[in-house]
Swiss-Prot record:
Keywords: Metal-binding, Zinc
Keyword Zinc among UniProt keywords: yes
Highest taxon listed in the record's lineage: Bacteria
Residues that, per the record, bind Zn(2+): 9, 12, 28, 32
Family from the record: Belongs to the DNA gyrase inhibitor YacG family.
Cofactor binding description: Binds 1 zinc ion.
Gene Ontology terms for molecular function: DNA topoisomerase type II (double strand cut, ATP-hydrolyzing) inhibitor activity; zinc ion binding
Functional summary from the UniProt entry: Inhibits all the catalytic activities of DNA gyrase by preventing its interaction with DNA. Acts by binding directly to the C-terminal domain of GyrB, which probably disrupts DNA binding by the gyrase.
Subunit structure: Interacts with GyrB.
Organism: Photorhabdus laumondii subsp. laumondii (strain DSM 15139 / CIP 105565 / TT01) (Photorhabdus luminescens subsp. laumondii)
Protein name in UniProt: DNA gyrase inhibitor YacG
PANTHER family with a match to the protein in the record: DNA GYRASE INHIBITOR YACG
Gene Ontology BP terms: regulation of DNA-templated transcription
Keyword tRNA processing: no
Length: 65
């Protein structure tokens, strides 16, 4: 008999079973999933990086030669 793995919802902290019975995992609900998506869309969350790329017109995305 295996024990169910549980985690905390990253948005509200509610306990979530990690498995097929939790379709929004790691979130507890669609609401928490959408809250997280909104935070990314509003740039409240970001993936840290070494360089600071700006949105200026002179940034081409190409490495300097």
């Amino acid at each position: 008999m295996s024990e169910l793995l549980t985690i905390e919802c990253p948005t509200c902290g509610k306990t979530v079973v990690w498995g097929e019975i939790s379709p929004y995992r790691p979130f507890c609900s669609k609401r928490c999933q959408l809250i997280d998506l909104g935070q990314w869309a509003n740039e409240e969350k970001r993936i840290p990086s070494q360089s600071e790329n700006s949105d200026s017109d002179d940034w081409s995305g190409q490495p300097e030669q």
